[in-house]
A protein has these predicted regions:
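A ligand-binding cleft/hinge motif common to bilobed small-molecule-binding domains
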Residues: 116-122, 239, 244-262
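Mature extracytoplasmic/periplasmic domains
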Residues: 273, 277, 281-341
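Extracytoplasmic ligand-binding site segments that recognize negatively charged/polar headgroups
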Residues: 56-71, 83-99, 105-242
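Extracellular/periplasmic bilobal clamshell ligand-binding domains
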Residues: 323-365
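Bacterial lipoprotein signal-peptidase II cleavage site
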Residues: 12-29
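Extracytoplasmic "Venus flytrap"
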Residues: 24-42, 50-69, 277
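Periplasmic-binding protein-like
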Residues: 152-156, 216-221, 227, 260-285, ...
Length: 365
């Protein structure tokens, strides 16, 4: 698409010329810019970002939706140093860091958040519409660009087929064969993927994405049966066999199969829970131009295809498929899903989060 071509062309020309001297005024105008037009075009944004020279990201594991390659590609392309803090942090950790480091040069410039945490912190975000904003479905973005969904997937169960039988449903996980083997990716009151796991359990047990009481009850039963592990799973625990069953997004579970050949991904049919993560700019970003250039890169064809390469479903997939710019091989390799996905609304997520905050610890501890 034209945007991607423009980014590449401008990056090449600015790499051969010195950054603008007036970095102070550039930073000031970038902090209030709501689109690239406010800065006089993409070339001005690139120059301002290169003058800042740095971008602070947080809670982006290298193996999560291909963020390792995404960060490297962005840094190499624009000559900007990307500081990646707390790669294994939760969405709430991102917000906590922004609050604790406010006014400091190492505060997060951008956020990548689970929907429940994002909804509770909209006041911290700076509105910005990327050049490809029109390609993003209306229900997956704030009209002003205060937050925008970026990539998504479906909640799944990953399991080591060499250590446990293949589950046919969530109910199977309550069986003795899974004793001490099931892990949830994080604390659902803080982490988006764990929150999705509870919502999936609610759907599978007669609840809804809003009424998640049955999901909380399910994990309480898992805990009582001795099947739920008090361990946050990652690649190391999966490969070592410490966490042979993991609730997580399908793109994360599927990526583990490249390192452990016996690792399989199961998306329960009939209870398909879909969710997108949320991209936003910290309104107090110490590098406001770099933060906005990062957004332009992520929502370009190049950035979207890099997410797709990591098994995630980019938010512009439909528009890119129509335009013929999507990576067809990576798109065809996505895990197959049966049934109509349920994608929670803001209100449903807020109500579910409220119930979870009041009841999770009592049920699971």
């Amino acid at each position: 698409m034209a945007v991607t071509m423009a980014v590449a062309t401008i990056a090449a020309t600015t790499a051969c010329s010195p950054p603008e001297k007036d970095s102070g005024s550039s930073g000031s105008s970038a902090a209030s810019a709501t689109s690239v037009a406010d800065l006089g075009g993409l070339d001005k944004l690139v120059a301002a970002a290169r003058a800042e020279g740095r971008l602070n990201v947080i809670a982006l594991p290298p193996n999560w939706a291909n963020y390792g390659e995404i960060i490297k590609t962005f840094g190499d392309k624009y000559g900007i140093t990307v500081n990646s803090a707390q790669p294994d942090g939760s969405s709430q950790d991102e917000i906590n860091a922004a609050e604790q480091l406010k006014g400091q040069d190492k505060a997060p410039d951008v956020f990548d958040l689970g929907s429940s945490v994002a909804i509770a912190n909209v006041a911290r975000f700076a509105p910005y519409k990327v050049s490809t904003f029109a390609d993003i479905p209306d229900n997956l973005k704030d009209p002003a660009g205060t937050w925008v969904n970026d990539y998504g997937g479906y909640m799944s169960i990953g399991y080591d087929s060499a250590k446990v039988p293949a589950p046919a449903s969530l109910a199977d996980l309550l069986k003795p064969e899974y004793k001490g083997k099931v892990a949830l990716n994080g604390d659902p009151t803080q982490a988006g993927s764990a929150f999705g796991g509870v919502q999936l359990a609610a759907l599978a047990n007669g609840g809804t994405v809003e009424n998640i009481a049955p999901g909380v009850e399910f994990f309480g039963k898992l805990k009582k049966a001795g099947n739920l592990l008090p361990v946050d799973p990652d690649s190391a625990t999966i490969q070592s066999g410490q966490t042979p069953v993991v609730f997580d997004w399908d793109y994360l579970n599927a990526s583990e199969a490249t390192k452990l050949k016996t690792w399989k991904t199961f998306v329960p049919g009939g209870t398909v829970l879909g969710s997108y993560y949320v991209q936003a700019i910290n309104k107090d970003a110490p590098h406001p131009a770099a933060a906005r250039l990062w957004q332009e890169f992520l929502y370009s064809d190049e950035g979207q295809n890099l997410w797709l390469k990591g098994g995630a479903r980019p938010v512009r997939a439909q528009a890119m498929e129509k335009a013929g710019t999507i990576d067809k091989t990576a798109f065809a390799a996505l895990p197959k899903v049966e049934g109509t996905p349920v994608i929670p609304t803001e209100d449903q997520t807020a109500k579910a989060k409220e119930y979870l905050a009041a009841n999770w610890a009592k049920a699971v501890g």
